[in-house]
């Protein structure tokens, strides 16, 4: 495997340049579809059946590829996203380039490099005959960076049809893979009071800002140690004139949840918040909810990790796993009850920034590692 992978290093760089130099921001569906077509052709060339779906009202391009019957669960699901956070025109400003052992460009790390890893792994497995027995389902969506609103059910359904999931989000510097992620949610609290003259008739007013301030203090108590909840009020709006008691105030809250208990606690808190005003005759409404459940590893995940770690050791590669506050579609596959390992893409960092990069030396290392893991899974199929 190693020699075959190393012989294709320049091809990988050519492929990476092609992909990075395609604008595929979440709002630019033509670019996302172009990415999907690139992979569709390559997957079909190694015997996969493919389809490009247009999901949701916005017709988000999503690619599915599979090499065995869909009537049985696939041995592995390869999961990734084709969209980036960057707007149309970003590629023209700063196209793909290489400098000092690193590759730069929009989405090079998050996560076009990872998508390409999955392709080159499968091409390697095809060359070595592993795909004769191993069943793989590939699912690439086009709206991950905006919350996977149109594709989450599709991802969940495909995960349920798989025995395990590899998510090709970036591997962190130092070969740090991801087994645990916090869940994410947001809530908007809208308080309606009663306007009045702040000087002449303040007693006739109901101060929405005061009510909101007290609610914010209550929200902050969610952050107690061990609660499994991080609740951060990040936006506040209220009042429009100095001499008027404000009749409306709004706060927005970023929620991160470490475990399923934290998820329940946050949902319960905001569900009953409108029923617990501090001021009389005030009206409170709450919008939002939990968007991504927490990614919490169980013993099946750690068993899968043991295989990855063993194969890394064979390659003299030191790896470890981490927990992170950022979310991915791996949150959904874990919630589906399917063992999931994330961060299977290229080593890199500075995601969502202009100095985003991947480490070139990680290309062959990561492809070889994952190919060996897949081969092991194939040889020990039950």
What is each model feature region?
Residues 111-182, 378, 382:
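Acidic/histidine-rich catalytic neighborhood of metal-dependent amide-processing enzymes
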Residues 75-77, 103, 163-167, 188:
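Short glycine-aspartate micro-motif
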Residues 86, 102-116, 197:
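Glycine/serine-rich anion-binding loops at beta->alpha junctions
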Residues 1-106, 127, 330:
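Acidic/His- and Gly-rich active-site-bordering loop/insert found
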Residues 79-80, 139-141, 166-169, 190-192, ...:
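Short beta-strand segments
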Residues 77, 135-139, 285:
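A structural signal for isolated positions on well-ordered beta-strands in alpha/beta enzyme cores
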Residues 7, 24, 56, 170-173, ...:
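Metal-dependent amide/peptide-bond hydrolase catalytic core
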């Amino acid at each position: 495997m190693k020699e075959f992978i190393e012989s294709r290093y320049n091809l990988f760089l050519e492929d990476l340049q092609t992909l990075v130099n395609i604008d595929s921001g979440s709002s630019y569906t033509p670019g996302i579809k172009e990415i999907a077509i690139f992979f569709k052709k390559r997957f079909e060339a190694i015997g996969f059946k493919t389809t490009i779906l247009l999901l949701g009202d916005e017709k988000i391009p999503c690619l599915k590829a599979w090499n065995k019957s869909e009537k049985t669960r696939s041995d592995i699901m390869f999961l990734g996203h084709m969209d980036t956070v960057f707007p149309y025109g970003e590629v023209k400003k700063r196209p793909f380039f290489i400098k000092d052992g690193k590759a730069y460009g929009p989405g090079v790390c998050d996560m076009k490099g990872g998508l390409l890893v999955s392709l080159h792994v499968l091409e390697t497995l095809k060359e070595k005959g592993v795909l004769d027995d191993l069943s793989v389902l590939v699912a690439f969506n086009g709206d991950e960076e905006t919350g996977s609103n149109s594709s989450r059910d599709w991802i969940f359904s495909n995960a349920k049809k798989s025995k395990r999931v590899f998510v090709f989000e970036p591997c962190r510097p130092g070969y740090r893979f991801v087994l645990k992620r916090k869940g994410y949610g947001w809530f908007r609290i809208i308080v309606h009071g009663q306007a009045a003259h702040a000087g002449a008739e303040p007693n006739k007013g109901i101060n929405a800002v005061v009510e909101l301030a007290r609610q914010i203090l209550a929200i902050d108590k969610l952050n107690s140690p061990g609660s499994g909840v991080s609740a951060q009020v990040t936006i506040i709006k209220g009042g429009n004139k100095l001499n008027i008691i404000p009749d409306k105030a709004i706060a927005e809250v970023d929620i991160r949840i470490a475990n399923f208990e934290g998820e329940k606690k946050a949902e319960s808190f905001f569900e009953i918040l409108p029923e617990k005003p501090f001021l009389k005759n005030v009206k409170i409404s709450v919008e939002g909810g939990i968007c991504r459940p927490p990614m919490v590893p169980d013993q099946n995940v750690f068993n899968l990790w043991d295989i990855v770690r063993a194969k890394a050791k064979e390659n003299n590669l030191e790896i470890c796993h981490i927990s992170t506050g950022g979310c991915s579609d791996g949150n959904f596959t874990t919630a589906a009850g399917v063992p999931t390992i994330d961060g299977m893409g290229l080593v890199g960092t500075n995601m969502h920034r202009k100095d985003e990069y991947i480490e070139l030396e990680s290309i062959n290392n990561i492809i070889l590692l994952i190919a060996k893991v897949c081969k092991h899974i194939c040889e020990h199929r039950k």
